[in-house]
Amino acid sequence: ENKKKFLVIGPLLALSYKEIFNKVKENKMWLGYAKQLSGFRLDDGTELLSKNPEGSVPRACKWYTNLDVSYRNDKITLTESVKDKKYEKYYNYKAINITKTLKIPYDYKGEMGVPISFISKYKPKQFKIIGKGTVVKKTKTWKGDKASLWTEKNGKPHKIPFERILIQNRKVNES
């Protein structure tokens, strides 16, 4: 808000917080270079390693920043075509379900639901973030569930088990 530069370590799941997600969506904050931190040293010299002597693993952490990181200007090479593959459509929202970033089609103009892990690969010049799947207005509900995205399996609605981010390709056919 006050235009100061920052670099903060936070839990991966912070992306699911409304305030954090909105900052990412508005390009006011993004992930830094490190893909995932599972060990680091604290000021007092204490080391948090991937596994401590008791065998437990610290939670996955990310760098959250508004500092310029060059990878954000790169492009994800998209090799899939919507014409060559059948993508699941949502039962209650006009978009297709994408299971992995590598499966994003280069020739699809509509909205797509991608896993929340997409944020670590997000390129703002290539993609537009529409919103989180749990908060966009649905076309219909199933069993009173107004938040979840559903696909259709065997003729019946099937709940998507994990949060989805809805995106749109700004550069259709430019893979």
Where are these regions (language model features)?
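Class I S-adenosyl-L-methionine-dependent methyltransferase catalytic core
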Residues: 1-175
